[in-house]
């Protein structure tokens, strides 16, 4: 007996119960065959996966990539080039093979020694918690997790940490929130901002010119940062001072750098602290950095005047778009290169790129910038799922979000790398400001 499209169908899972209509599932024969005399389908499947499949059939914009294995068992045809099945803790995932290999060392070895199973590796159980694995997947895609304590699991899978290479001497403008900053020389009015001896480097933080200080190190900053000590002159000598009170804003270990807000050498803060004597703010504040931390460069930044701030600066256009085709059917490629002179307008020589994003059907791995063949920046990209774009994370330090601005100089060459060879079009979006 045929069923009407409005006939309710109950679906029972391992840990839940759902209802849909026959009209939603009737085009999928495998699901129809599972309907019993009580108009019920019993599935040995988790409820969250069934819910995703049903919403997909109802026309919602949701992806079934990760659960394609279960979807295909129910008669849906979900397939993508370069994707394979893996089994983690009894749950099968459909993943981009090249992408997961590039991010997790574990899977390079796993695929190498089990290549005879390609493309379905689900017969081999990776004995780890699948719920934690899903957080690992979110982590390597640049998405936020509710639980950031993944170090043990990331160590197990052998996370390939993105390599950040930054040569600060090539970048003169920075931004953070709504403020813009310009790099200033380390000597103003014949007063040095820092000096060093055989034991440590001393950086003076109480100059009225300085707003931010960025310190780049030669190697990764250790967990124990006792080699960074703040001192304030009190009475007849210097006393150690609390790091947070001294403006230590954030530490980025992946980029081997720290960000410090300079303590103003002025009386501005006295307005908010009426009981504090003015002389308190004129006492020198110093940061002492042990030589074992190996400072590579210290960058002093001055906040640009209010008429130079992004909110008051004339944006030439909300976004410019620059499109670059690459690859061909006979010659696939995994990168595309271009020079700034190809898309920045000569009419605006005094400008900086404020925001940048990349859009491509192919997955982007990282971005490289060279100046006269010298590598000045290597940066990963963050995927923004809601907008289906990648944002270039040139320099982002924790929640402070300090970013480099790219000056309009024609000697800069961009190269965008992809996870696999392809034919595609790269869309480069950017917003520029007058300086």
From Swiss-Prot:
Coiled coil (residue ranges): none
Limits of the BTB domain: 80-149
- InterPro entries, alphabetized: SKP1/BTB/POZ_sf (IPR011333), T1-type_BTB (IPR003131)
Q: Which domain of life is it from?
A: Viruses
Which Pfam families does the record cross-reference, listed alphabetically? BTB_2
Biological process (GO) annotations? Answer: protein homooligomerization
- Please report which protein family the annotation says this sequence is part of: Belongs to the mimivirus BTB/WD family.
Which named protein is this?
A: Putative BTB/POZ domain-containing protein L275
The upper taxonomy is: Viruses, Varidnaviria, Bamfordvirae, Nucleocytoviricota, Megaviricetes
């Amino acid at each position: 007996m045929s069923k009407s499209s409005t006939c309710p169908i109950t679906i029972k899972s391992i840990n839940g119960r759902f209802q849909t209509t026959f009209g939603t599932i009737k085009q999928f024969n495998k699901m129809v065959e599972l309907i019993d005399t009580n108009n019920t389908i019993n599935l040995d499947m988790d409820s969250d996966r069934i819910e995703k499949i049903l919403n997909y059939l109802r026309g919602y914009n949701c992806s079934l990539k990760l659960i394609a294995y279960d979807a295909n068992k129910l008669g849906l045809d979900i397939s993508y080039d370069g994707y394979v099945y893996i089994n983690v803790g009894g749950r099968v995932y459909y993943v981009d093979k090249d992408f997961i290999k590039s991010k997790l060392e574990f899977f390079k070895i796993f695929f190498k020694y089990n290549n005879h199973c390609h493309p379905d590796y689900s017969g081999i159980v990776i004995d780890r918690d699948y719920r934690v694995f899903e957080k690992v997947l979110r982590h390597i895609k640049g998405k936020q997790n509710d639980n950031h304590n993944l170090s043990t699991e990331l160590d197990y899978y052998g996370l390939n940490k993105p390599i950040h290479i930054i040569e600060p001497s090539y970048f003169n403008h920075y931004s953070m929130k709504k403020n813009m900053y310009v790099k200033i020389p380390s000597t103003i009015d014949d007063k040095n901002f820092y000096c060093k001896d055989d034991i440590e480097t001393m950086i003076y933080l109480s100059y009225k010119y300085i707003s931010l200080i960025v310190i780049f190190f030669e190697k990764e900053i250790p967990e124990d940062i006792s080699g960074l000590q703040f001192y304030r002159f009190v009475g007849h000598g210097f006393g150690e001072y609390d790091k947070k009170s001294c403006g230590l804003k954030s530490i980025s270990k992946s980029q081997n750098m720290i960000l410090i807000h300079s303590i103003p050498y002025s009386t501005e803060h006295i307005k908010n602290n009426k009981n504090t004597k003015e002389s308190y703010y004129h006492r020198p504040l110093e940061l002492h950095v042990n030589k074992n931390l190996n400072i590579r460069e210290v960058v002093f930044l001055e906040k640009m005047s209010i008429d130079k701030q992004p909110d008051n600066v004339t944006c030439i256009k909300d976004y410019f778009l620059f499109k670059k085709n690459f690859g061909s059917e006979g010659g696939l490629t995994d990168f595309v290169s271009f020079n700034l002179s190809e898309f920045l307008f000569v009419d605006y020589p005094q400008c900086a790129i404020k925001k940048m994003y990349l859009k491509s059907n192919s997955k982007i791995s990282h971005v490289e910038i060279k100046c006269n063949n010298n590598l000045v920046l290597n940066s990963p990209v963050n995927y923004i799922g809601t907008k289906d774009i990648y944002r270039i994370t040139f320099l982002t330090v924790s929640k402070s979000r300090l970013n480099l601005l790219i000056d309009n100089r024609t000697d800069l060459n961009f190269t965008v790398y992809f996870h696999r060879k392809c034919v595609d079009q790269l869309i480069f979006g950017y917003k520029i400001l007058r300086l």
